[in-house]
Amino acid sequence: MNLSRDEFVHGSPLQARVDLREIRDEDLIVMVQNGQRKAFDELVARYKGRLFSFILRMVKDPTLAEELTQETLIRVYLHADKYREIARFSTWVFTIATNLVRNKMRQRSRRPLLLSLNPAPEDDEMPLDPPDLRQDPTEGIHREELAAIMAAATAKIPEKYRVPFLLREVEQLSYEEIQQVTGLKLGTVRSRINRARNRFRQAIKPMLRNETLLAELERIEARAAEEDNEDKD
C-alpha cells in the first residue's frame, strides 16, 4: 500500500515504513510542524555540517561557528510553524543563519578579524575559506594544502562580494534565493557574484600548480559563461 503525500506528511500509522532520507526537505519541515521529531532529526543530519561550514567561513572561529549552528537549528525547530513553501527550505535555513551571523557581528563589531555582513567599504576584505572541494587532490598535493591555496584566493574577494559568491558557488543557491537571503536587489546579486568570480580568477591563476585547481577554475568560468549566455537570450 502506498501512502499519499498528505497521509505521510501529516501522520499515518504506516509512515515508519518510509525512509525519511527519501523525503524532500520541504515535506520534512511540514512533518516537524505536525510534531514528528524524527523528521527534524533528519533535517539536522542534512544541514548541520553545511551550516557549520558556511558559518565558519564567515566568522573564522570554530567555537562561535558551532554556537551559531546550534542556534540556527534551534530556531528552525522552534519556528518551524512559520515556514511556508514559498521558498526552498534551504533558502529559509540560510536566511536564519545569515541573520544570526549579522547580529553576532554587530555585537562584536570592534573585533576586526571577524566578518561583518553589514554594508562595508569597497575594499574591506576578510579572509574566508574557499568553496568545497568535490574532487580528491592529485599530483602529490594534499586536500589541506589545496584548500589553503583556494582559501588564500577567496580571501582576496571583498566581503560584500564574497557572501553572495559562497552562497552561489558553495551552497548552489539560485540568484533569486540569494536575493532573499541577503536582501539585495537581483541585479546587485548578479553584479557582486560576477565581480567575486573575477577576483577569484585573478587570485587563483598565479597559484595554479595542478589539475584539480585548474579544473575548479574552469568549472567557475564555464558556469559564468553559461549564465552570461542565458542573460543575452
Model-derived regions, located:
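Acidic, proline/glycine-rich intrinsically disordered inter-domain spacer in sigma factors
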Residues: 13-19, 23, 123-152, 224-228
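Short amphipathic alpha-helical boundary/capping segments
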Residues: 27-31, 149-158, 203
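Arg/Lys-rich amphipathic alpha helix in sigma70-family domain 2
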Residues: 78-85, 95-116, 195, 204-206
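Short helix-capping/turn signature of helix-turn-helix
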Residues: 46-49, 57-60, 166-173
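C-terminal edge and immediately downstream basic/flexible tail or linker adjoining helix-turn-helix-like DNA-binding
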Residues: 2-11, 112-119, 149-152, 166, ...
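Short, charged helix-capping/linker segments at alpha-helix termini
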Residues: 17-18, 33-42, 52-71, 186
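Helix-turn-helix DNA-binding module
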Residues: 151-188
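Structural recognition of an alpha-helix C-terminal capping motif at a helix-to-coil junction
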Residues: 53, 67-74, 87-99
